[in-house]
Amino acid sequence: MKRYYGFAGVGLALDLPDGEDFSEGRELPVFACEPRAGMTDVTVRIADRLIMPEGKIRAALPNMTEYDCGDAIVRCFGALSDGADNSGIIAEYRESGIRITMKRSVYRKITASAVLETIGTERLVGMAGGAILHSSFIEVGGKAVLF
C-alpha cells in the first residue's frame, strides 16, 4: 500500500506492508497529496526481530545509535539502542531512499508519528532549503497550511 504526503517542500512516498495496521493519526491526512517527482521513498516493514547493523558507530545517544555501514547510514532507535535486540526501530538511509523496520513486539501497528520521527523530517526539510523552528498547521478545504 502506497501513501503520499507533502509538506514544507518535502514529498514522502510511504510504501507500507499490505495487511498491517497503519494509523495516520489525526494530523497526517491533511498532508496527503498525489505522487510527484522528487519524492523521498520510505519503505516501512514490521519484523519479528531486527538485524544488528555491521559498521562503525558514528554517534551514540541514550535512545539512538548511528552506524556508518559504507553504502548506508543505519540508526537504531529505542530505550536501549545499543543493538538490534534492544531497539524498536532500525532505519537505513541510502541514496535511493529510507528503509524502516519496526520490531513487532514493540509496535503492534505502524504509526505515522513513529515513521516521521524516525526519518528525521526536519533534516529532509533542511535539505530542501527550508527550516522547521516550530510547526503548526491549519486545515483549509481538507488540506493543511503549514506555518
Language-model features: locations:
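A noncatalytic interaction/capping subdomain that flanks phosphate/NTP-handling catalytic cores
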Residues: 1-144
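Hydrophobic anchor at the beta1->P-loop junction of P-loop NTPases
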Residues: 147
